[in-house]
Amino acid sequence: DVCSSDLIMEATTLSEARVYVGTYAKYNNGSLYGAWLDLSDYSDKEEFYEACRELHEDEEDAEYMFQDWENVPEGLIGESWISENFFALRDAVEDLNDTEQEAFFVWCNYKSHDLSEEDADDLIKAFQDEYIGQYDDEEDFATQIVAECYELPDFAETYFDYQRFARDLFMCDYWFDDGFVFRAA
């Protein structure tokens, strides 16, 4: 119900994040030996690095090389580092469904949020304040607003210009990106 802002959202792929962990020494000696580690198995960065140490216990002071990764957003990992904020963000989005998580990253990108620096809980709260839902296009959203918020007689619905109403809504009050509608803040 758009009028009362009681919107239902959907789950997360951060829970499926994984990293292939090798070392620079092995790589420089022609070996790609390593293993895929599921980040959901670790509560924080320190636990993850402990698993890396165990995996490469044959090396003293191993320099870990993250040779590949899946479901880790840009800016939270590189070849030789992983952001502490990944684990906080993963935990913060735990209650979001897949659709909401996708919308969250669209929102973060549109707003140019730095996922490696900003507080994960604050990001989720701000996202939830602005997220409306998933729609085919701006006119689809405008049609729903009219249906839920205005009691137009049946004959008037056929004359209502949903396209212009959508244009007006998205001029200042809302924005649309990649199938998602957000409140302009």
Which residues fall in each region the model found?
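Structured domain cores in non-transmembrane regions
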Residues: S43-D114
